[in-house]
């Protein structure tokens, strides 16, 4: 309790430390950053706190509190990811995770299953939409004020391990028990793909993850086989993801040597010019792209490439305005930083990053 109170008491100092010029992270994690006077000053301050402060404090905890403040002073998209959160953050874009294959909402402080993934671990044992989860591995979770993120941590786990669920079902007065073996759960990024008329296919992409291009291409091929000659790509609400997925998708619609995106950074290896290679399967198809104020980053790269090459009709609202490219670097303690390393520009030279 003593250490906890001391850590809280030092939060104002932590915030002040985070504003000191020179990034302390570089001192410890990168040989690219010179040892500036600001970095030496911050290192000395932390050393003095650790050795001379009247009460014992946890320097690691102070540093954990400092790093997010430091990153927040760069730009809106550079961020620190604690080790405890890195797996969940990566899973969202990696295309799969190990879990039980359900989605849920909290209704009256109770986990309520609203979707069971077909063929997933939960469906195999008989869990159904509408089921309410009362216990997880003999721990009461209903009515306990447990937040969604903690429920997710309890349900996810290593592939092949088991979790026991106590379920209440509307047509039963008894608590039903299910042992579910965790398995790989796909994270689909194409929400929908269907014909809206005999010659027009509609595809909705919710994010740009590692599997997005293959999902997207497979959807287009199936729609083309069903008669589609033209397509509507819905990127509304798509906040972005991996830039290379947007580039690969754009390549499917552009003739050879069409500019797709330029990136410009501080270092030479963060600058690039990307052009289509002419191997796209849908170069002759008409395309409409739907965007809104939540379409960002990779969505804007794709839409910008289509617009500046006069390749598609862009319909909707002004997009979000995220023209910064981040690189994720894993640190020795398994935490990570996502650091902005370049700005991207559409083929006509526009950088759509809004002011910050």
PLM region descriptions:
Residues 3-31:
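Hydrophobic alpha-helical transmembrane signal-anchor segments
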Residues 17, 25-38, 46, 50, ...:
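Cleft-lining beta-strand/loop regions that shape enzyme active-site pockets
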Residues 41-45, 62, 69, 93:
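Membrane-proximal extracytoplasmic alpha-helices
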Residues 57-75:
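An acidic helix/loop motif centered on a single conserved Asp/Glu
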Residues 65, 76-115:
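PDZ/PDZ-like peptide-tail recognition elements
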Residues 130-132, 350:
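Structural motif
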Residues 333-342:
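Short acidic, Pro/Gly- and aromatic-enriched capping/linker segments at domain boundaries
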Residues 347-356:
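Conserved functional hotspot residues or short segments at active or partner-binding sites
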């Amino acid at each position: 309790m003593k250490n906890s109170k001391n850590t809280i008491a030092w939060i104002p100092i932590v915030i002040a430390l985070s504003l000191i010029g020179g990034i302390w992270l570089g001192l410890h994690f990168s040989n690219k950053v010179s040892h500036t006077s600001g970095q030496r000053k911050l290192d000395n301050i932390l050393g003095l706190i650790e050795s001379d402060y009247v009460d014992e404090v946890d320097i690691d905890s102070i540093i954990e509190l400092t790093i997010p403040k430091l990153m927040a002073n760069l730009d809106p998209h550079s961020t620190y990811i604690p080790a405890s959160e890195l797996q969940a953050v990566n899973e969202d874009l990696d295309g799969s995770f190990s879990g039980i294959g359900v989605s849920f909402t909290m209704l009256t402080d109770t986990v309520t299953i609203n979707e069971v993934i077909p063929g997933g671990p939960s469906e195999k044992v008989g869990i159904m939409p509408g089921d309410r989860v009362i216990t997880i591995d003999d721990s009461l979770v209903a009515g306990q004020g447990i937040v969604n993120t903690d429920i997710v941590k309890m349900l996810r786990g290593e592939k092949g391990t088991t979790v026991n669920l106590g379920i209440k079902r509307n047509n039963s007065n008894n608590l039903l028990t299910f042992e579910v073996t965790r398995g790989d759960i796909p994270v689909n990024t194409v929400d929908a793909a269907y014909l809206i008329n005999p010659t027009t296919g509609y595809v909705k992409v919710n994010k740009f993850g590692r599997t997005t291009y293959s999902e997207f291409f497979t959807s287009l091929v199936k729609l083309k086989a069903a008669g589609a000659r033209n397509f509507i790509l819905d990127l509304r609400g798509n906040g972005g993801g991996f830039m290379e997925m947007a580039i690969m998708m754009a390549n499917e619609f552009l003739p050879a040597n069409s500019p797709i995106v330029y990136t410009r950074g501080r270092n030479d290896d963060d600058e690039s010019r990307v052009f289509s290679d002419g191997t796209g399967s849908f170069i002759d198809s008409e395309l409409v792209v739907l965007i809104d104020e939540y379409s960002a980053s990779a969505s804007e790269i794709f839409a910008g490439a289509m617009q500046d090459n006069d390749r598609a009709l862009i319909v909707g609202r002004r997009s979000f305005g995220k023209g910064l490219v981040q690189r994720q670097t894993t640190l020795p303690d398994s935490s990570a930083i996502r650091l902005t390393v370049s700005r991207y520009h559409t083929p006509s030279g526009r950088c759509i990053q809004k002011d910050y």
